[in-house]
Amino acid sequence: MNIYLVGGAVRDSLLNLPVTEQDWVVVGATPEQLLKLGYQQVGKDFPVFLHPVSHEEYALARTERKSGQGYTGFTCYAAPDVTLEDDLLRRDLTVNAIARSADGEFIDPYHGKQDLENRVLRHVSDAFGEDPLRVLRVARFAARFAYLGFTIAPETMSLMSNMAQSGELSALTPERVWKETEKALKTQSPHVYFQVLRDCGALAVLFPEIERLFGVPAPEKWHPEIDTGIHTLMTLAIAAQLSPEVDIRFAALCHDLGKGLTPKEHWPHHHGHGPAGVKLVEQLCQRLRIPNPVRDLAKLVAEYHDLIHTVNKLRPETLLKLFNAIDVWRKPERLEQMIMTSEADARGRTGFENNPYPQGDYLRAAFQIANGVSIQEVVASGLQGLAIRDELQRRRQQALAEWKQTQETASI
């Protein structure tokens, strides 16, 4: 029996990155041998065991053979005669197919170390094409390692394109698509994930609402990049700089979906694209079973981001309606989420990337004024029921009106 460290732990250590979890492969053993040593079996479809002390995963070396559609349609063979090279051959990328022995020796039959040095993501074998999930995984790795200069090998991108055209991606479950997408949204360069999916044709299959934005023009005065799809990915890139939150990054991705519905004769203008985009966000989130908190913020951003851009021109009653709409009284964190996504939208334009976003400070100050109105004083005035709500609204609106007056006077 021989045990090797494999996969991401080896890859990340070679890149001098933190190793968060370790996976091991066991060659020349049977399930019975591992069970006798105190390992606990957890894999149903293939033999994976938890170490009795470290609880890290140890898998028997195995091969896989395509036996059906999708990423679950595989027959697994695990036995003592399966070699380490056999096991590494079934892996997705060469950089993930490097093993390290107990004495520190690297076993690298598919030249993963060379691809790491050259910053290339390359598939190990043509068996890559049998698992549609790998299209998303490679796009995610491209996003994760983009800051290190990694690119996808042309032959791997070609294979991914063939997979996108084959119809195999339709075998992916919504939960699996969202899980990979959520991981990609957490990377340093989430926009790269969607760009890779577009380049191989998978975006049109899995995210048609986003694909539809490419080729849709916006006024050059406000959008020198012109193309709404390009603007969308630029917005996502800025959002990733502003916040690590998946909710904010996803909302940035979806903020302009409504522009994909604008009739061509109205181009490059997109009046009413905000409310129109809300239905598309709902549709996308239902299809991929995206969590409700992520969906809710994306819908609010789609509807109100343009209003926030003009916040300093809004009447007190409109400001109050905005605060009520985003439910900022019960969910004050929404204010920063809305500001950050709107800022990402404003800066996600060619030549605007480093511009300040004073609307954010204005909105924060307006909220402080409105939120400073005492609910206790309204209740103490003797009002009952809905009259309390109405009086609270009136006082908040009055406070905003007085504050705006002082703001305007100060700027003269």
Curated annotation (Swiss-Prot):
Domain notes: Comprises two domains: an N-terminal domain containing the nucleotidyltransferase activity and a C-terminal HD domain associated with both phosphodiesterase and phosphatase activities.
A molecular function GO annotation: CCA tRNA nucleotidyltransferase activity
InterPro entries: CCA_bact, HD/PDEase_dom, HD_domain, NT_sf, PolA_pol_head_dom, PolyA_RNA-bd, tRNA_CCA-adding_enzyme
Keyword Manganese found: no
UniProt keywords, alphabetically: ATP-binding, Hydrolase, Magnesium, Metal-binding, Multifunctional enzyme, Nickel, Nucleotide-binding, Nucleotidyltransferase, RNA repair, RNA-binding, Transferase, tRNA processing
Residues annotated as binding Mg(2+): 21, 23
Enzyme Commission (EC) number: 2.7.7.72, 3.1.3.-, 3.1.4.-
Domain HD: 228-329
Quaternary organization: Monomer. Can also form homodimers and oligomers.
Pfam families: HD, PolyA_pol, PolyA_pol_RNAbd
HAMAP family the record matches: CCA_bact_type1, CCA_bact_type2
The protein's role, per its UniProt record: Catalyzes the addition and repair of the essential 3'-terminal CCA sequence in tRNAs without using a nucleic acid template. Adds these three nucleotides in the order of C, C, and A to the tRNA nucleotide-73, using CTP and ATP as substrates and producing inorganic pyrophosphate. tRNA 3'-terminal CCA addition is required both for tRNA processing and repair. Also involved in tRNA surveillance by mediating tandem CCA addition to generate a CCACCA at the 3' terminus of unstable tRNAs. While stable tRNAs receive only 3'-terminal CCA, unstable tRNAs are marked with CCACCA and rapidly degraded.
Extra remark: A single active site specifically recognizes both ATP and CTP and is responsible for their addition.
Organism: Yersinia pestis
Protein name: Multifunctional CCA protein
